[in-house]
Amino acid sequence: MKVILKIRFNASSESFEKFGQNRYFLYLSNPEHEHSSQIIVKILSRKLGVPLEKINFAFKDNTGNWVFDVD
């Protein structure tokens, strides 16, 4: 299944909210950097209850959404 995230970096507090079928808002207090996708995979694993190895970063679309494949 595909999971789509709208991510706001540098937020005042961290939160994870569902807003549709396989769509989530993720607010992170740290800035975006080259290892952001690895951090997000760990958060998704914890929040969705899925093992780390079953979640893979797919792409970042042209609207800024982050797309992950969850097996």
Predicted regions and their residues:
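Contiguous, often N-terminal, cationic amphipathic patches that form binding interfaces
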Residues: M1-D71
